């Protein structure tokens, strides 16, 4: 992005661009189980998660490295988003962090297993596998558009009613 390059040209040049976006859904077959994958901040991108669910993911695996954000709420924010993704897609989510809290989250958003931040360990946890699509995944991007349209229509109706009342009001 040219705007960032103008702000810090010496730093922008240090960021490698030796990768490109894939063309397949972010779903991998792991011994017959289809797992949707997202790395770090990918979890915030609705289309990526929906594509994984639509691509047949039976669970999601989110990996992240929160080392740069120690002492902040970033890890808890990512866990909250992972929890929301479990509920939204109706799938189990395994959120694994190199230094932050790691959790196994059930499709209903409840925590099944967890490791605290900065605690070395491993979890071996049975997770529920699910197929099918939730209304959130099916409707996806339509919901914000419909809400925005509803807001515009509501404001237009309110504006028309207000102008009609003003026109009918007796003058003093």
What are these language model-derived features?
Residues 1-172:
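Enzyme catalytic cores with a strong preference for nitrogen-chemistry domains
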């Amino acid at each position: 992005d040219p705007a960032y390059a103008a702000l810090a040209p010496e730093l922008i040049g240090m960021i490698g661009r030796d990768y490109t976006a894939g063309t397949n859904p972010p779903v991998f077959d792991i011994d017959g189980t289809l797992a949707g994958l997202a790395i770090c901040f990918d979890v915030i991108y609705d289309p990526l998660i929906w594509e994984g669910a639509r691509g047949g993911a039976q669970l999601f695996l989110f990996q992240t490295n929160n080392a740069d954000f120690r002492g902040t709420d970033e890890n808890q924010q990512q866990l909250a988003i992972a929890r929301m993704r479990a509920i939204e897609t109706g799938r189990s989510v395994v959120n694994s962090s190199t230094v932050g809290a790691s959790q196994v989250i059930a499709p209903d958003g409840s925590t099944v297993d967890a490791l605290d931040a900065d605690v070395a360990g491993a979890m071996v946890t049975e997770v529920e596998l699910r197929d099918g699509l939730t209304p959130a995944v099916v409707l996806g991007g339509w919901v914000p558009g419909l809400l925005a349209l509803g807001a515009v229509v509501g404001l237009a109706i309110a504006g028309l009613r207000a102008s009609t009342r003003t026109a009918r009001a007796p003058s003093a």
